[in-house]
Curated annotation (Swiss-Prot):
Pathway: Aromatic compound metabolism; 3-phenylpropanoate degradation. Belongs to the PheA/TfdB FAD monooxygenase family. InterPro entries: 3-HPP/3HCI_hydroxylase, FAD-bd, FAD/NAD-bd_sf, PheA/TfdB_FAD_monoxygenase. It comes from Escherichia coli O157:H7. FAD binds at residues 17-46, 285-295. Pfam families: FAD_binding_3. It catalyses: 3-(3-hydroxyphenyl)propanoate + NADH + O2 + H(+) = 3-(2,3-dihydroxyphenyl)propanoate + NAD(+) + H2O; (2E)-3-(3-hydroxyphenyl)prop-2-enoate + NADH + O2 + H(+) = (2E)-3-(2,3-dihydroxyphenyl)prop-2-enoate + NAD(+) + H2O. This is 3-(3-hydroxy-phenyl)propionate/3-hydroxycinnamic acid hydroxylase. HAMAP family: MhpA (MF_01652).
């Protein structure tokens, strides 16, 4: 219910297609993606500027692929440290688990350290590319209300002036204490950890050793992390009876740092801050014309670095669907698949993060003894040890329902999983990552075949209205065979041989890839038409009003 101010006339009225509450990483990613799709966006943020202190320190391959989708990855990479290993240590300093996955199936290193404020600044600068995106800081969201075809937001500026925003949709990216979620009375189920952790960031890294170390000390567990630009992060468990004020006192801070540094007096402190680790999940992600994303929808402990990355997955999943609905290319039932696809995986990442925290700081002493024993035993079980150290236990996003069409058993199907991103060779000889050849679009990718062959003229018209790219993959040595060219089809060479292996493994020759790079369906040329009809129905696509021209893609 909106708060009414009958005696105060609003200073400004805004009318937009999408209002985003919160200029954190998820809100800024949503704004960048929608901006490049031509959607009119307004971001409103309570603070007067971006948060400038480090928070998240881990960005994964999926999040970098999301940055790539909005043309910002080259600006983000200088603020990352790729291939960032995570090492678990016993109290005596023995490494019992060294997690350093070395695969790059999605085009980027799987584990990377990063400096969040600098990456957030890249995204804020990124929205300036789009005249249809505006960001308003120092705007407190006082109230909002939903009507059949719009959401009305009531804002207050730092000077006390009122503004009204009329939007078709509201995306709440306003954090774990989300005003939007609380106003809608959406349950935020889960637990708050009984213990807290104090985070200490130091400039001119006094250790300068690479990677991140988690020391499972039963007296006081701690974390030591090397970050880009010579920043060192330490995290110490706050013990019962201690307060943030006490730990901030110089003598107590010196005592903490003496645990990890030979000279705790010779440091350049950036900041200290106490955190409570929560594990909570919103019961619903969509409430009519309001959608929850990022921490507003789920929060999790930091131990797997997945809070930030889960928020990026939300933005990538939601943004393309919202754009299609606003453009009239799909009905709003498509937005129901956002919760259907994202909520279960967010829960899996919460559970994994809680488990990792329990490995670092077991709730009971005997659990620590068991952990140490199991870690020793793993040395005699190399396949099991590799399973953990290569992070194969990480729940890869897989959707079992939603905007996809699956034939056969789900367990072995690639449908609902992210498609690989190898390097490909273009016809002009350039070598690039696959997504760069596709852009922010759907793609129908065929191994060796003309992907248009199994489609009717009506289907070609429908999918071209979505800016779908049609890709023919051939062995690299065939890339200049002119007679195989087809109008409206982009030919690429399989530079690394990974696409051939993928299609051979999954017994398919055609894949329909969504804009968020997930496999929506697989087929062979003779079944593609039927599959596309099913997918169009599942996604509630509308029919294009006019013919879409077919042009030759060089």
């Amino acid at each position: 219910m909106a708060i009414q101010h009958p005696d105060i006339q609003p200073a400004v009225n805004h009318s937009v297609q999408v209002a985003i509450a919160g200029a954190g990483p998820v809100g800024l990613m949503m704004a960048n993606y929608l901006g490049q799709m031509g959607i009119d966006v307004l971001v409103v943020e309570k603070l007067d500027k971006l948060i400038d202190y480090p928070r998240a320190i881990g960005i994964d391959d999926e999040a970098l692929r999301t940055m790539q989708s909005v043309g910002l990855v080259d600006n983000v990479l200088p603020h990352t440290t790729p291939w960032h290993a995570m090492r678990f240590l016993t109290p005596k300093g023995r490494c019992f688990a060294d997690i350093q996955p070395m695969t790059d199936e999605f085009g980027w290193p799987r584990r990377n350290a990063f400096i969040q404020p600098q990456v957030d600044a890249v995204m804020l600068e990124g929205v300036s590319r789009f005249p249809n995106v505006r960001c308003l800081f120092s705007r407190e969201l006082e109230a909002f209300s939903q009507q059949d075809d719009e959401v009305t937001l009531h804002l207050k500026t730092a000077e006390g002036l009122r503004e009204i925003v009329k939007a078709q949709w509201l995306v709440a990216c306003d954090g774990g204490a989300s005003f939007v979620r609380r106003t809608l009375n959406v349950p935020f189920e889960g637990k708050t950890a009984p213990n807290q952790w104090i985070v200490v960031d130091i400039a001119n890294d006094p250790l300068s050793t690479p990677h991140i170390y988690l020391c499972c000390d039963p007296v006081r567990p701690y974390v030591s992390a090397a970050l880009p630009h010579a920043v060192r992060r330490f995290e110490f468990m706050v013990m019962p009876g201690e307060t943030e004020e006490q730990l901030r006192e110089p003598q107590n801070m010196r005592k903490l740092l003496s645990k990890v540094l030979p000279n705790p007096d010779n440091v350049e402190l950036i900041r200290q801050r106490v955190y409570t680790h929560n594990a909570r999940l919103a019961q619903r992600f969509r409430i009519d014309r309001v959608l929850l994303a990022g921490d507003a929808a789920h929060i999790m402990p930091v131990w797997q670095g997945q809070g930030y990355n889960s928020g990026m997955r939300d933005a990538f999943n939601l943004a393309w669907k919202l754009a299609l609905v606003i453009q009239g290319k799909a009905r709003d039932a498509l937005l129901d698949t956002y919760q259907q696809e994202r909520r279960d995986h967010a829960k899996a990442m919460i559970d994994l993060s809680v488990t990792a925290g329990n490995v670092l700081a077991p709730p009971k002493r005997w659990q620590g003894t068991l952990r140490d024993g199991v870690s020793w035993l793993l040395n005699y079980l190399p396949p099991v040890k590799r399973y953990f150290l290569e992070m194969r236990f990480k729940p890869m996003p897989q959707y079992y329902g939603g905007a996809l069409v699956r034939e056969g058993e789900a367990k072995h199907s690639p449908v609902g999983k992210m498609f690989i991103q190898p390097k490909v060779t273009l016809e002009n000889g350039d070598v690039t990552l696959l997504d760069n050849a596709i852009g922010a679009n759907f793609a129908v990718i065929g191994w060796g075949c003309n992907p248009l062959w199994g489609m009717s003229d009506e289907q070609i018209q429908q999918w071209r209205a979505l800016s779908t790219r049609f890709i023919q993959v051939v062995p690299e040595v065939q890339i200049h065979t002119a007679q195989d060219n087809h109008d409206g089809v982009l030919r690429v060479g399989d530079t690394q041989g990974r696409l051939r292996s993928w299609f051979a493994q999954h017994n398919a020759s055609l894949v329909v890839m969504r804009p968020d790079r997930f496999v929506a369906a697989t087929a062979i040329p003779q079944t593609l038409g039927k599959t596309l009809n099913k997918l169009a129905s599942v996604m509630t696509l509308t029919r294009p009003d006019a013919d879409v021209s077919v042009e030759k893609v060089a």
